[in-house]
């Protein structure tokens, strides 16, 4: 009788990938990166084990939003003080906080809980074209579509 393969956390081999966000649509980029962080692209994917790879995203400031979302999409946050609801448009986020904009989109697509927090630590986002992870010898990852 055959048994289903279950990966163990100490047996997982992790690769490093570089993804260029220039000209990419935010949601499509985020869903594919979230899939890499989860490890769903591997044949050894196990839902309860972090089998994902490390992802470096460069050129976050050049990500693309479709339609009129640059002006219409609003990001909300709360300061935890009375009357402390703050809001920013997607245009403000892209010009002032491009890293946070991409991280929010990707983290929203990861599992909620301990495993999702562990997966999100393998995400590195940079606004420009430079990154400090050359020592890891990252592979360039070509997005589908």
Swiss-Prot record:
Signal peptide stretch: none
SUPFAM superfamilies the UniProt entry points to: Ribosomal protein L13
InterPro entries: Ribosomal_uL13, Ribosomal_uL13_bac-type, Ribosomal_uL13_CS, Ribosomal_uL13_sf
GO molecular function: mRNA binding; structural constituent of ribosome
Biological process annotations from GO: negative regulation of translation; translation
Any one annotated GO CC term: cytosolic large ribosomal subunit
Gene3D superfamilies: Ribosomal protein L13
Keywords assigned: Ribonucleoprotein, Ribosomal protein
Domain of life: Bacteria
Function: This protein is one of the early assembly proteins of the 50S ribosomal subunit, although it is not seen to bind rRNA by itself. It is important during the early stages of 50S assembly.
Entries under NCBIfam families matching the protein: rplM_bact
Family per similarity comment: Belongs to the universal ribosomal protein uL13 family.
SUBUNIT field: Part of the 50S ribosomal subunit.
Protein name according to UniProt: Large ribosomal subunit protein uL13
Source organism per UniProt: Bacillus cytotoxicus (strain DSM 22905 / CIP 110041 / 391-98 / NVH 391-98)
Gene: rplM
């Amino acid at each position: 009788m055959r048994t289903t393969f279950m990966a163990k956390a100490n047996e997982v081999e992790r690769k490093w990938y570089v993804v260029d966000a220039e000209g990419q649509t935010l949601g499509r980029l985020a869903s594919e990166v979230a899939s890499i962080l989860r490890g769903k692209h591997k044949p050894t994917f196990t839902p309860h084990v972090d089998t994902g790879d490390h992802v470096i995203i460069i050129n976050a400031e050049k990500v693309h939003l479709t339609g009129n979302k640059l002006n219409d999409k609003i990001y909300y946050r709360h300061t935890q003080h009375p009357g402390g609801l703050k809001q920013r448009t997607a245009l403000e986020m892209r010009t002032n906080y491009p890293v946070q904009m991409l991280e929010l989109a990707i983290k929203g697509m990861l599992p909620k809980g301990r495993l999702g927090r562990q997966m999100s630590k393998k995400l590195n986002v940079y606004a420009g074209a430079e990154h400090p992870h050359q020592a890891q010898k990252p592979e360039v990852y070509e997005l589908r579509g």
